Amino acid sequence: MKVLIASKSDPASMQMLSYLEDNYDIKENSGRRFVKDFEIFVIEDRHIFHDMNLGNNYEYAVVLSRHSSAADIKSLTAHPTGNFGPKADLGGRPKTINVSCPKYMSGTLRQMLESYSGTKFQVTFEATHHGPIFDLPNYYVEIGTTENEWTDDDAKKTAVDAVINPDAKDFPNFVAVGGGHYAPKILEYFRRNEINIGHIISKHDHDDLEEWQIKDAVEKTPSCKGFLVDRKGTRSRVRDMVKSISDDLGLELIMI
């Protein structure tokens, strides 16, 4: 069993939940609601500040969320959670990341890429960022960036259908390093190769990044096979740390 989380404080989250309720067979049992192999949780407060203690009866969790972008990028995104940096302004804890969910996060993004045929939205990963704290593997699926997009029928269908029926593959799992927040080179490699992505360490987190945090990203990317590194989008000292860790742990190192 998996968990699907929506927040009443997030308009995009509730729009996606409404699409789910209108288009899928929701089962109820003793006050609990289920769709396929997901249990549905609806919380009152904003999910990024709502630390999750769900127990060990679930395989992973997906949070339905809005995406905000100062650049007004219209997007459908998937990303891991946690903070590599020294601040936690958007939930979670400083320098603390959750266990990622590479098979199903990648499967969800792969399905969105396959099913979305429009031109309005950019379908992409985001780097690991924001809370909450989770006690099981998890990822976010987001629609950005204004109410016009949050209520878009194609966006809701693409996102929710991909969460419920991800194109999940048993490909090798990698930690991605480098590039900007949307990791375009990582995304392009992902689209052309049989690979799953776990944590994504953006170049914006490289100034304060410590070696133990890179090892932590490996440990919190289940069955991690290696690193996928955007060479030009990675600080040289971070490249050196990644190389050293990959050598020490016998991990594959792919430079792009």
Curated annotation (Swiss-Prot):
Enzyme class: hydrolase
EC number annotated for this UniProt entry: 3.1.1.96
GO molecular function per UniProt: D-aminoacyl-tRNA deacylase activity; zinc ion binding
Reaction(s) catalysed (UniProt annotation): a D-aminoacyl-tRNA + H2O = a tRNA + a D-alpha-amino acid + H(+); glycyl-tRNA(Ala) + H2O = tRNA(Ala) + glycine + H(+)
Cofactors that this protein relies on: Zn(2+)
The record's free-text note on cofactor binding: Binds 2 Zn(2+) ions per subunit.
GO biological process, one term: D-amino acid catabolic process
Keywords recorded for this protein, A-Z: Hydrolase, Metal-binding, Zinc
Pfam families, per the entry: tRNA_deacylase
Keyword Metal-binding: yes
Zinc among keywords: yes
Record text on subunit structure and interactions: Monomer.
Family: Belongs to the DtdA deacylase family.
Function statement: D-aminoacyl-tRNA deacylase with broad substrate specificity. By recycling D-aminoacyl-tRNA to D-amino acids and free tRNA molecules, this enzyme counteracts the toxicity associated with the formation of D-aminoacyl-tRNA entities in vivo.
Protein name: D-aminoacyl-tRNA deacylase
Species whose genome carries this gene: Thermoplasma volcanium (strain ATCC 51530 / DSM 4299 / JCM 9571 / NBRC 15438 / GSS1)
Organismal lineage: Archaea, Methanobacteriati, Thermoplasmatota, Thermoplasmata, Thermoplasmatales
